[in-house]
């Protein structure tokens, strides 16, 4: 589950609903521990007793963002994981390439990548590209009335690719479809 650091209330609700869909299922939620959508995904996973994996752009001795350090500890205390390719003592201020590497790892660890909210450009779009390159299933939230706002421009762009006969596995999710998905998952046997 990935998206903007500047989460809007609609997206907050969507992330919570989407993750709640997996309650009582043997799945782990992967995200990047950033503020906004990532933070919401990890918190929702913990609230629903799901394991969560936080992929870091930094080393374990320099958890970023610092504001989510306690969340990182809570993830581990609840059986989740912190994943990084940087050893302790790595530079304190990660370079842009660290975030791109984090996005690559997130996509690689996931069977399905859910884009909750994305503007253009941004790290979320990088994660979407990795997901498609790795032939992962990509699910993109499609807002109803707010779909033309800046916060969903990345979502809109990705969903436009569905209609261009691209050989991509992109799913569109509206809030109603997430509820239907929740009901079907409740009946599914993983």
Regions found by a protein language model. Give the residues of each.
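Glycine-biased, small-residue-rich flexible motifs in mid-sequence functional cores and linkers
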Residues: 2-190
């Amino acid at each position: 589950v990935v998206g903007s650091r500047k989460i809007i209330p609609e997206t907050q609700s969507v992330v919570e609903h989407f993750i709640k869909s997996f309650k009582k299922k043997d799945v782990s939620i992967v995200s990047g521990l950033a503020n906004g959508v990532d933070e919401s995904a990890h918190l929702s996973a913990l609230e629903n007793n799901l394991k969560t994996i936080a992929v870091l752009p930094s080393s374990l001795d320099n958890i970023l963002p610092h504001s989510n350090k306690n969340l990182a500890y809570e993830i581990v205390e609840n059986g989740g994981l912190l994943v990084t390719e940087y050893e302790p003592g790595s530079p304190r201020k990660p370079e842009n390439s660290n975030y791109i590497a984090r996005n690559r790892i997130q996509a690689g660890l996931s069977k399905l990548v859910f884009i909750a909210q994305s503007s253009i450009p941004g790290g979320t779009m990088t994660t979407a590209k990795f997901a498609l390159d790795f032939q992962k299933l990509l699910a993109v939230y499609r807002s109803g009335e707010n779909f033309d706002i800046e916060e969903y421009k990345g979502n809109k762009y990705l969903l436009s690719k569905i209609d261009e006969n691209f050989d991509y596995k992109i799913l569109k999710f509206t809030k109603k479809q997430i509820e239907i998905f929740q009901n079907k998952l409740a009946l599914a046997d993983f």
